């Protein structure tokens, strides 16, 4: 197979694209082919166009506000299913992203996040053209410490380049491992072996397929992803997580991000520069904290789904509720890092610098509100996790899964949320007030929603009574008292109705 790198590709990254294309040879060797894939650079004087279907081309584009960094479409023979052509597109914003990684996290000749990112992105898109789908469970192969140890991971710290993996960052005091995978993972090699090895017998295929429940080969794709609140059940199938202990990894990641945010003025606010990059990087890192915590929230009410053949893998069950201890650990991290009074606190001098460049184009959505919209930002991050935990499907699953092992019931879940959101004697920040009000609205809405089961509704009813009692307070400043009076009125009205 020959893949051509379009001649419009920036010269400095061409070697990385070539490396990403030919990186698949490691997998094809397992299938019995040596040098199965070759990458070539399209000559500047080529007499053929990159859009010519006769050529498999990795093209380069600069689309305004692209949704993805790359696309890996292919053309298949409708009669046989055979893939006959590939036309990969990679976006210029991928290079910008790589240089941002360098600027934030540093780089060396031996460990360059820009190089690894482009190699990984290219391998991912080439993988699609070879017939592979996304595998979002692949990140669960190593624990939160092993994932940084290249002596264990080699050139791939996840099970597949077909995952949507974030940049891998080692916490303070730990050597930096791979930023991104630069070779096929165990799942990739296994899938290519199954799909491309010539002359496989039925017994050979059965033997290969029997490995599907082993940790290095587990698979979950888009239709199983827990990306939106209440959708799907297996927390391993989440886009953008890392390690088989996402709780520990997320706790480490938040410390790393918080430390880096404090360094942003020294990195970006230098002579002759506007604060645009400073602003966008601050928002990006803050949202990243929310995304990781959102992934942790999926453990609450989660069920591991293992697709097995009944006469094989008898030591594995199709459904396994996430252990109680892990759900409680997940809740504790969410309480401390997402819902607590000091989960989001910002230096006023820092915030004053969050100015964007003035653009000539009119933006109807902003309507001149160019000041930092921090409360919307924080509530959006908190609300996403809360929306998942309180989703009627998740509440029902907590109850249903109690029949096969779950012991973390809705009443305890809501009690833990109450303890984090309403703290006796605490003067809530304005961020916390927003959270409290939104949480109360969510409970009131749930109480009147027929999609909730009766056990969950009774827990919601009980929690609202606790909030009604809590908000009869006389301490705090005027803003606090007015806020709690309003919450008390909302809850009382809902319960009376």
Where are these regions (language model features)?
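Fold-level signature of zinc-dependent metallopeptidase catalytic domains
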Residues: 1-48, 109, 497
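Short loop/turn segments at secondary-structure transitions that flank enzyme active sites
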Residues: 9, 64-66, 92-96, 136-138, ...
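Sec-exported extracytoplasmic/periplasmic mature domains
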Residues: 22-33, 127-128, 132, 167, ...
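Carboxylate/His-rich catalytic cores and anion/metal-binding grooves
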Residues: 25, 32-90
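The catalytic-center signature of Zn2+-dependent metalloproteases
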Residues: 41-61, 116-173
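Conserved catalytic/binding loops enriched for acidic/polar residues
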Residues: 139-497
């Amino acid at each position: 197979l020959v893949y051509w790198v379009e001649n419009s590709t920036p010269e400095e990254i061409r070697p990385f694209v070539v490396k990403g294309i030919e990186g698949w040879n490691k997998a094809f060797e397992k299938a019995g082919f040596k040098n199965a894939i070759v990458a070539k650079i399209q000559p500047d004087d080529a007499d053929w166009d990159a859009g010519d279907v006769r050529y498999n081309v990795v093209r380069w584009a600069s689309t305004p506000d692209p949704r993805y960094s790359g696309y890996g479409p292919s053309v298949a023979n409708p009669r046989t299913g055979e893939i006959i052509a590939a036309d990969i597109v990679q976006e210029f914003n991928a290079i910008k992203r790589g240089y941002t990684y360098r600027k934030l996290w540093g780089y060396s000749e031996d460990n360059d996040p820009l190089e690894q990112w482009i190699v990984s992105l290219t391998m991912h898109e080439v993988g699609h053209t070879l017939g592979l789908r996304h595998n979002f469970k692949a990140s669960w192969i190593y624990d939160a410490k092993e994932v940084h140890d290249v002596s264990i991971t080699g050139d791939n710290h996840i099970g597949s380049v077909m995952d949507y993996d974030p940049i891998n960052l080692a916490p303070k005091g730990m050597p930096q491992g791979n930023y991104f995978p630069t070779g096929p993972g165990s799942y990739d090699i296994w899938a290519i072996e199954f799909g491309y090895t010539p002359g496989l017998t039925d017994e050979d295929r059965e033997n290969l397929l029997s490995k599907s429940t082993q940790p290095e080969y587990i698979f979950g794709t888009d239709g199983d992803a827990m990306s939106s609140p209440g959708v799907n059940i297996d927390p391993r199938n989440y886009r953008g997580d890392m390690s088989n202990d996402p709780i520990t990894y997320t706790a480490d990641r938040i410390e790393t991000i918080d430390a880096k945010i404090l360094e942003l003025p020294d990195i970006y606010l230098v002579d002759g520069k506007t604060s645009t990059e400073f602003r966008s990087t601050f928002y990006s890192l803050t949202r990243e904290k929310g995304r990781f915590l959102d992934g942790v929230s999926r453990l609450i009410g989660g069920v591991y789904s293992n697709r097995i053949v009944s006469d094989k893998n008898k030591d594995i069950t199709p459904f396994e509720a996430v252990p109680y201890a892990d759900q409680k650990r997940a809740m504790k991290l969410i309480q401390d890092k997402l819902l607590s009074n000091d989960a989001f606190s910002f230096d006023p001098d820092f915030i004053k610098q969050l100015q964007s460049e003035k653009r000539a184009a009119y933006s109807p959505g902003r309507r001149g509100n160019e000041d930092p919209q921090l409360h919307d930002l924080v509530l959006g991050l908190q609300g996403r996790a809360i929306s998942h935990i309180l989703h009627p499907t998740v509440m029902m699953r907590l109850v249903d899964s109690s029949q096969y092992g779950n012991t973390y019931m809705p009443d305890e879940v809501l009690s833990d949320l109450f303890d984090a959101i309403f703290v006796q004697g605490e003067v809530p920040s304005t961020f916390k007030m927003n959270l409290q009000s939104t949480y109360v609205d969510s409970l009131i809405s749930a109480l009147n929603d027929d999609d909730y089961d009766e056990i969950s509704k009774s827990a919601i009813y009980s929690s609202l009574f606790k909030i009604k009692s809590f908000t009869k307070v006389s301490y705090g400043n005027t803003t606090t008292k007015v806020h709690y009076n309003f919450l008390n009125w909302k809850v009382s009205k809902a319960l009376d109705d």
